[in-house]
């Protein structure tokens, strides 16, 4: 008790066939959330518009309201603009159109699970001389939405040594997932086990497994590693270890001076 959780300011207009919330600004200790909502009846259907904008919201304090023991923290950015036209409230999601952009910069999140997946199997299992902590730098997800179907434009996770790129679709209308995630070591290594993973099925019972052809491609990469890896060392794409600049560019944002 006694802690200020935040404040909210909003402008509300209600009529018989129209509802406008523009703007609604929620000021929290970690940042601000801006929401705009508009629905209007155009017989026989309704038009719906929703915009959500969050810039650099520190979410650690919010999580601790629900779980005081959590040490999770970080910064989240959201820029979402969605529209729908439907004659039934239950079908609004089926007709969604718009964009969803999300970027998360977590703190103190280890990336060992990514290293085992996508870096070097042998050296990941051996004791390491270098005990420098590896971390998850950021997560970026950008989707275009059409008729309730979210299609990925730019989706990836960046850690100290690994980038995981993802593509696919999220079918909101039918509540189905069809995603493919493929890891890439920032510095190619011999005996890489960067096998693509597929996530498919309904929201409440999806399956995670090796993508079709994943094992075959892994075996081919192992076989050609003696040539491929040295070549990548010489000519491969370079990614900064901290990943911050990579994530900002993926969102088409100007890179902050402190991140350069």
Please tell me what each predicted stretch does.
Residues 24, 51-53, 103, 155, ...:
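Transmembrane beta-strands of outer-membrane beta-barrel proteins
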Residues 2-11, 17, 26-36, 55-87, ...:
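Amphipathic hydrophobic-ligand
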Residues 69, 116-122:
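Flexible, surface-exposed loop regions and adjacent strand-edge segments
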